[in-house]
Each structure stands twice: as structure tokens, then as C-alpha cells.
Regions:
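Rossmann-like dinucleotide-binding cores of NAD(P)H-dependent redox enzymes
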Residues: 133-136, 140-171, 175, 252-292
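Rossmann-like dinucleotide/flavin-binding elements
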Residues: 10, 17, 112-137, 176-188, ...
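Ferredoxin-type iron-sulfur electron-transfer modules and their immediate structural context
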Residues: 1-110, 158, 200-217, 287, ...
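Redox-cofactor binding/interface segments in oxidoreductases and associated redox assembly factors
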Residues: 198-201, 222, 241-242
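Short gly/ser/thr-rich secondary-structure transition/capping motifs
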Residues: 92-98, 178-181, 219-227
Length: 292
């Protein structure tokens, strides 16, 4: 792994106007990171990654890199782009456990964060480093939101979320699981209890219906509901998945792991929105594809 990422870093052209950085939604300074890696300045590279994006250890695994940083790499026009996701993952994974928590001067203000998904975790870490006393309110028993309950283990190890939780606790962030805001506790109660600000990061958990006949039948499930608790669903041996996005690939691969013998993905047209490597994995694991 280490030799691989060094080889990849050495391929970086250090473009004056790096398109890879422009292709990243949060503008990760990719040429700078690759150069620091080549200079054996691993911790410095990790510090820059986490300052830019505290969720670097997650994004380097689950982001759609081929449409973002790697998809914009100029080397990809004639050959293969730099595999920056592997570089970032190696650095951020190494840095996460070794990151030293700085001495933070508290400003005396309390902030409530509702929801512990990627947005909630990012905001909590940023605010804690800025001196705020942060409390996260999470309605489920574990933090992570969609990272915990929507992305399968084979795509994102849940141990990464546990490591984030440990680091957050070291930062003094308080986590209150199994706490629903909006029933017994409302936002007004939080302000009454001394919180100066409230961040709402509850995510988008409600699936979107497609409006076709039979959609409400008992053996028809939304992908997000299935991925949350696949062991609670009895799909049978023959499963149809409507859609060609990354969620559809996750559903198909999960179904095969939970006893389905035949899984077929259906699309209305010829377009596949899932990343090419997720499609490849899904095909390798035995799923079939049917296009309209």
C-alpha cells in the first residue's frame, strides 16, 4: 500500500492550476498533499487534510472520486489519473489516531448539534476546536448517521466511526445518544438550557417514491430502509433492484450477502450513475443488469 501511494504521488505533475483541486467540492490542496507525502511529512499532510475536512478519513473511502478529483486529473486524458483517494486515505487513516488534541481556550459558549451524521460530526469538531462546548444529540444508539446505518460495512468500516467518536470525546464533545429532539425535548428547551446556537443536521432519511403501480406492496422496500437493517428483511432468493446508482449497488451486494441467489438491477435507460468500480464489484459478485 505504501509503495503504491508513493508511486502515485510521484506521478503528480504539480499543475499551477490543479484541475483535481477544482474538481473536489471542498478544494482539497492535492498537489501540496502529494508533495508533503514525498517529503515524508505525513503528519503535516494529515493536519492540512483534517483542517480542510475533518471527515477526510471517510471521504477518502466513499466519495465519488472518479467524477471529482480523479476525474479532473489531467493525466486521465491520455492514461490513468492519480489515485488520490488512496493517498488521502493512507494519510488520514494514519493521522486520525495520532492526531494530538491541542489545548483549547474555551469561550464559555454552548452549542447543540442535532444529528451525528457527517455534517453534525464536522460542525462539532470545528466548533470544539474553536473553543465552544459542544453537545451532540443523536436519536439512534450509535453516531454516524448514514455512515453508520446507510453505507454497508464492506464499503465503509464502522471502526472508522468508532475512532472518530473517541477523538471527539478527547476534544470534549459530549454525545447524547437515544435522544430525540422534537418530542419531549424541543429546540426552545435547548435555548432555555443555555445553548447559544443550535445546528440541525438531521439528514435526508425519507425515501422518494417513484410513483409506479405495486410500489406499496408488502414485499417492496426502499433502499435506504433495507440498508439500515438488512437482517430484518426477508427478501427471498430472487431480488429486483430498481435503479443504477451507488445505493442500488449497495443494495444488490448486500442482498447477495444475505442469502439472495439471483439479484437483477433494472434501469429505464442506458445511463449508470454509480461509480464504475462499484458497478464492477456488483457484477463480480453475481448481479445482473437490465436496461430499458
Amino acid at each position: 500500500m505504501k509503495l503504491h501511494i508513493i508511486d502515485e504521488a510521484e506521478r503528480c505533475l504539480k499543475c499551477k492550476k490543479p484541475l483535481c483541486q477544482q474538481g473536489c467540492p471542498i478544494h482539497t490542496p492535492i498537489p501540496q498533499i502529494t508533495q508533503l507525502l514525498l517529503e515524508n511529512r505525513l503528519m503535516e499532510a494529515g493536519e492540512i487534510l483534517f483542517a480542510n475536512n475533518p471527515m477526510s478519513a471517510v471521504c477518502s473511502t466513499v466519495c465519488n472520486h472518479e467524477n471529482q478529483c480523479e476525474g479532473h486529473c489531467v493525466l486521465g486524458r491520455k492514461s490513468s489519473p492519480i489515485h488520490f483517494s488512496s493517498i488521502e486515505n493512507f494519510i488520514s487513516d494514519s493521522y486520525l489516531d495520532r492526531m494530538e488534541v491541542p489545548k483549547i481556550e474555551k469561550n464559555g459558549k454552548k452549542v447543540a448539534v442535532i444529528g451525528s451524521g457527517p455534517a453534525g460530526i464536522t460542525v462539532a469538531i470545528k466548533l470544539a476546536l474553536a473553543g465552544y462546548k459542544v453537545t451532540i444529540f443523536e436519536e439512534r444508539s450509535k453516531i454516524g448517521g448514514m455512515l453508520q446505518y446507510g453505507i454497508p460495512e464492506f464499503r465503509l468500516s464502522k471502526s472508522v466511526i468508532d475512532r472518530y467518536k473517541k477523538k471527539m470525546e478527547e476534544l470534549g464533545i459530549r454525545i447524547r445518544p437515544n435522544t430525540v429532539i422534537g418530542s419531549a425535548i424541543v429546540i426552545d428547551n435547548l435555548f432555555r438550557d443555555g445553548y447559544s446556537s443550535v445546528f440541525v443536521g438531521t439528514g435526508v432519511w425519507r425515501p422518494k417514491a417513484i410513483g409506479i403501480k405495486g410500489e406499496s406492496l408488502g414485499n417492496v422496500y426502499f433502499g435506504i430502509d433495507y440498508l439500515r437493517r438488512p437482517e430484518a428483511h426477508q427478501l427471498g432468493e430472487k431480488v429486483a433492484v430498481i435503479g443504477m446508482g451507488n445505493v442500488a449497488m449497495d443494495v444488490a451486494r448486500t442482498a447477495l450477502r444475505h442469502g439472495a441467489k439471483e439479484v437483477t438491477l433494472y434501469a429505464r435507460g442506458k445511463r449508470i450513475s454509480a461509480s464504475s468500480h462499484e458497478v464492477s464489484y456488483t457484477k463480480l459478485e453475481g448481479a445482473d443488469f437490465v436496461f430499458g
